[in-house]
Design a protein with these regions (language model features):
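N-terminal catalytic or cofactor-binding beta/alpha core of small enzyme domains
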Residues: 1-104, 108-113, 122-133, 140-160
Length: 160
């Protein structure tokens, strides 16, 4: 169980899975609090995805609750950098390593939270519930961009 607006990523994953419309080589995971273990496995794997899209609810100064935006790994708020570390290696470090050392493009789609309650509370705030479709659109746009880039590469391969 996640804390209120911290359930934003799983809510987006659930809607994308229900909506469908992505190619067979795309996997949509509700990683919940297990994201570090998954990223660690990918870092150690010989076969890696071309792109990872992370969706999360964040608290970033100057943003309005419910605002959906893309953020660089380097610009993640301090309170998210060390979330639930795995062997003292924060998630952001794993994402950076996947990007810089493993050649995996990492995209972070975020929404400004209204608040994260201090205790377990089910459900998103109204602002974040309303942001789910916008985040889904951004993720689907990223997937479409990847697919068109693959088609362009394949289309150009046979031309001299």
């Amino acid at each position: 169980m996640l804390f209120g607006d911290d359930g934003f990523g799983p809510a987006v994953a659930e809607q994308i899975i229900r909506r469908g419309g992505f190619s067979d080589d795309v996997a949509v995971l509700d990683a919940g609090t297990g994201v570090r273990e998954i990223l660690f496995d990918i870092v150690l794997s010989e076969t890696r995805p071309e792109k990872i899209i992370v969706v999360d609810g964040l608290s970033v100064a100057g943003r309005s609750p419910g605002e959906v935006f893309m953020i660089s790994i380097d610009d993640l708020p301090e309170n998210k950098r060390d979330d639930f570390s795995l062997h003292q290696m924060p998630t952001s470090n794993l994402l950076k390593e996947l990007n810089s050392m493993c050649g995996v493009k990492v995209v972070v789609v975020a929404a400004q939270v209204e608040g994260i309650p201090p205790e377990v509370a089910p459900g998103l705030s109204g602002m974040l519930a309303g942001a789910v479709p916008r985040a889904c659109g951004m993720v689907m746009g990223e997937l479409a961009e990847s697919e068109s880039s693959v088609r362009a590469d394949a289309g150009g391969a046979g031309h001299a």
